[in-house]
């Protein structure tokens, strides 16, 4: 398949050649930063966290930054397929107002409004994220 490249060390490559990539082999799922580019992974996220990883029982570490962190946190929610669809829809439908005469909203305004969006999305469900029976969320950030 030309649309997918798999990078693996020698031992991992041999394992995949012999057994294929199985859900029980996954121990870490990374979620990169990248703003709206992360949304193109929505169908893959829904498959991986909706059906595929459900076929295994091991602990999985989810590591993410920026949109990758929100994607990985969403994987920890009850009904992840529905949650991923809502995350995508909410992200796409964001709208930022700004004052007359400004060419764009201020960074503070964007931060405040995005913070409210996160509260609206995850509010009341933080324990689902933090107490998932199998997934351990790790958020990478820098200032």
Report each predicted region and the residues it spans:
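Catalytic nucleophile loop
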Residues: 59-74
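Generic alpha-helical scaffold signal
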Residues: 34-42, 65-66, 81, 108, ...
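Short, surface-exposed basic-aromatic patches at helix termini and helix-loop junctions that form
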Residues: 53, 75-78
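Short loop/turn hinge sites at secondary-structure boundaries
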Residues: 19-23, 77-78, 90
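Helix-rich "cap/lid" substructures immediately adjacent to catalytic or cofactor-binding pockets
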Residues: 1-60
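Extended hydrophobic secondary-structure segments that form protein cores and membrane-embedded regions
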Residues: 29-30, 61-65, 137-140
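Patatin-like phospholipase catalytic region
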Residues: 79-143
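N-terminal, well-ordered alpha-helical segments
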Residues: 42, 46, 69-73, 116
């Amino acid at each position: 398949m030309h649309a997918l490249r798999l990078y693996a060390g020698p031992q991992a490559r041999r394992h995949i050649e012999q057994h294929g990539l199985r859900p029980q082999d996954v121990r870490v799922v990374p979620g990169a930063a990248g703003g709206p580019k992360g949304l193109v992974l929505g169908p893959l996220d829904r498959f991986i966290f909706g059906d595929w990883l459900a076929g295994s029982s091991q602990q999985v570490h989810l590591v993410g930054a920026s949109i990758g962190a929100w994607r990985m946190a969403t994987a920890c929610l009850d009904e992840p397929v529905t949650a991923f669809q809502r995350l995508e829809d909410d992200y796409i439908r964001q709208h930022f107002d700004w004052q007359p005469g400004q060419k764009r909203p201020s960074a503070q305004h964007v931060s405040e409004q995005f913070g409210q969006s996160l509260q609206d999305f995850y509010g009341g469900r933080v324990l689902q994220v933090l107490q998932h029976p199998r997934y351990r969320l790790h958020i990478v950030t820098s200032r």
